[in-house]
Regions:
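Short, small-residue-biased leader/transition segments that mark boundaries at the very start
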Residues: 2-6
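C-terminus-biased signal that marks the final domain/tail of proteins
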Residues: 8-161
Length: 161
């Protein structure tokens, strides 16, 4: 009961938020318009604290479309999770960041039905997949691999002719 109350109380602070557009309003004979699409979410917290990230993910998840395929659901998951990457240095005073960054080091999503784990890292935003179906857990002993072969984001150059 306590955690449910905490969740509800956190979200109650944002009862004024809703998905979609805000309708223009008349104020003293002047029509005022929203700044852009999605203005119904104006006021959603944007800082990197856990409570603010929780509120954002709750609203993003609640308004996400139902995906027709597992592939679409994984891509939608990463679109939502992209909003929660914490850049290196933002959590510390200027010049005080530790050697081990507390920034987002990897992001993952899991397809439980197809037994696949997807991930991307701070060094490579390409989504990678590990199929658990292809691993014979009776034969394979514990192993570990680096998440990245190289700590460098590949960039594809587009040549315009």
């Amino acid at each position: 009961v306590g955690s449910e109350m905490c969740i509800r109380d956190s979200l109650n602070n944002y009862v004024n938020l809703y998905p979609g557009a805000v309708t223009p309003q008349q104020w003293g004979g002047v029509t005022i318009f929203p700044f852009g699409a999605g203005a119904g979410f104006h006021g959603i917290p944007g800082d990197v604290t856990p409570p603010s990230r929780f509120v954002r993910v709750a609203f993003y998840k609640a308004t996400a479309p139902v995906c027709p395929t597992a592939y679409d659901a994984i891509l939608q998951s990463f679109h939502i999770l992209n909003n929660f990457d914490i850049p290196i240095g933002i959590e510390h005073a200027l010049g005080k960041a530790p050697d081990i960054p507390s920034a987002t080091q990897w992001t993952s999503a899991i397809d439980l039905t197809n037994r696949k784990v997807y991930y991307k890292t701070a060094y490579n935003n390409n989504i990678r997949c590990i199929s658990m179906k292809k691993i014979d857990f009776d034969k394979v002993k514990y192993q570990s691999y680096p998440l990245d072969k190289e700590l460098k984001q590949p960039i594809e150059e587009i040549i315009v002719k």
